[in-house]
Amino acid sequence: MIIIDNFIKDLDFLKKIEVNEDFWRGGYSWYDGWWGQKASNLREELIEMLWAENSPHPSVHTAGFEHWTHTFDYTNVQTKLDREWALSLHFDKDEKLCADENRFVSPLIGTVFYPCREIDELQGGMLYHWEKFPPQRAQDNGLFWPEEEPEIIKPKFNRLIIFDAGCLHGVSKIISGRRRAIAINLWDKKPTEFND
């Protein structure tokens, strides 16, 4: 896992993100990357800032970027393994392929970025991540609470988190405040959902 604070130096760009309704619109999107098409919106511009010249991760060959946003507050509550979560424990995967063929194919790399200052007022909403808990451990016996201790990362304004999104992770229950984040997964092959 890589965590970098104050990653984006252009704070005016982050202010634009905070107030841009299109940036925060729900749903999953795909971006082929700056080498295949010019960025056409703020999300794609952010992806380029994170992964082009400024990439904190060694170069990887990628087919592109799946991206989406989440806005959570205290009303978002899911229960899993007798605990309450804003975003329940899960593995990022090619969702359509998993539903159609029961195959788990995970992204190369996962990214979470917190572009809004209000995140610093948040209570709860921690990212829990188990580096040694891939989906194969849960397939036969169902999901169970891991013996290993998770990494627990506090959301923070302008914090970039790079991690293995194919391993178990989730977001703890929010006590107060609002948690807005963008998630970006790098894939070596475009997920089947985007092939239609």
Describe the function of each predicted region:
Residues 1-160, 166-196:
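Fe(II)/2-oxoglutarate oxygenase catalytic core
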